[in-house]
A protein has these predicted regions:
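Catalytic cores of Mg2+-dependent Asp-rich isoprenoid enzymes
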Residues: 1-68, 72-84, 96, 100, ...
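Long, charge-dense
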Residues: 89-93
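Acidic/His metal-coordination segments adjacent to aromatic residues that form catalytic metal sites
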Residues: 101-113
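Conserved, surface-exposed functional patches that form binding/active-site neighborhoods
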Residues: 154-160
Length: 237
């Protein structure tokens, strides 16, 4: 497989998971669109590693590999296809590599919501720093917004297992609903760089739709007009 085909495969994989992006990428500056999709594809890799089911050892090994790869990007070398688009960006890749091991700890059960956010603080801060280097100065509490989006993704992927101990009282569905409400309260709207704000608007809409269903991890079809409206507002900040 050629490098170009391998890169397209990773980008298409992310687009297939976020098909609504086709409606929203118009709100991202044209010169930033390719980089944004490549970056979000990498972020999705980290989310998948965090939310792995079963034996975590292969995921942990993959995380260690990514740490080495990101440090190579700092040295202007790359092996992964995504590096074709991302490695040339002068971003703090080493800072992100240093934060990746925190995902091991973030995967473990937490006592409360504060602890869940704290476990992701360094990782989210490193991602916010990379995004600032890529797309310009962020708005608002960029790192906190990223952490909230990661936890919302984890809520949908891991179910009751992700709930902090203080949120596991009584019925599982009710507990999931209650913690989703807490995450939404702590998720700053329209924070971060423009591409992140647009993606977060989509992620938040999905999260709210999943929360509204009786099957908590099921996602109802999102209404295109409403989604475009949210994307436009997010882009404007």
């Amino acid at each position: 497989m050629s490098d170009s085909v391998a890169l397209d495969s990773f980008l298409d994989k992310w687009r297939s998971r976020w098909p609504e992006w086709g409606l929203l990428e118009r709100f991202v500056a044209p010169q930033s669109r390719a980089t944004a999709v490549a970056w979000f594809a990498l972020v999705q890799e980290f989310d998948d590693i965090l939310n792995v089911e079963g034996d975590p050892l292969p995921a942990n090994a993959k995380l260690a590999w990514w740490g080495e790869e990101l440090r190579d990007w700092d040295a202007r070398r790359s092996r992964h296809p995504l590096g074709r688009l991302l490695e040339p960006v002068r971003a703090p890749w080493g800072q992100l590599a240093d934060a990746l091991p925190d995902l091991h700890e973030a995967r473990m059960g937490k006592a409360d919501t504060d602890a869940a956010f704290a476990a992701l603080a360094r990782h989210a801060g490193a991602m916010a720093a990379v995004e600032a280097a890529m797309f310009g100065s962020p708005r608002g509490e960029a790192a906190r917004a990223i952490a909230a989006q990661v936890l919302a993704e984890r809520w949908q992927a891991a179910g009751v297992a992700v709930l902090p101990a203080t949120s596991r009282e009584g019925d599982g569905t009710a507990s999931m609903q209650a913690w989703a409400a807490v995450l939404l309260e702590r998720w700053p709207r329209h924070a971060g760089t423009a591409p992140r704000r647009v993606w977060a608007a989509l992620a938040r809409a999905r999260f709210e739709a999943a929360r509204a269903t009786s099957e908590l991890r099921a996602t109802r079809p999102l209404k295109p007009l409403a989604l475009v409206w949210h994307g436009w507002r997010a882009a404007r900040g």
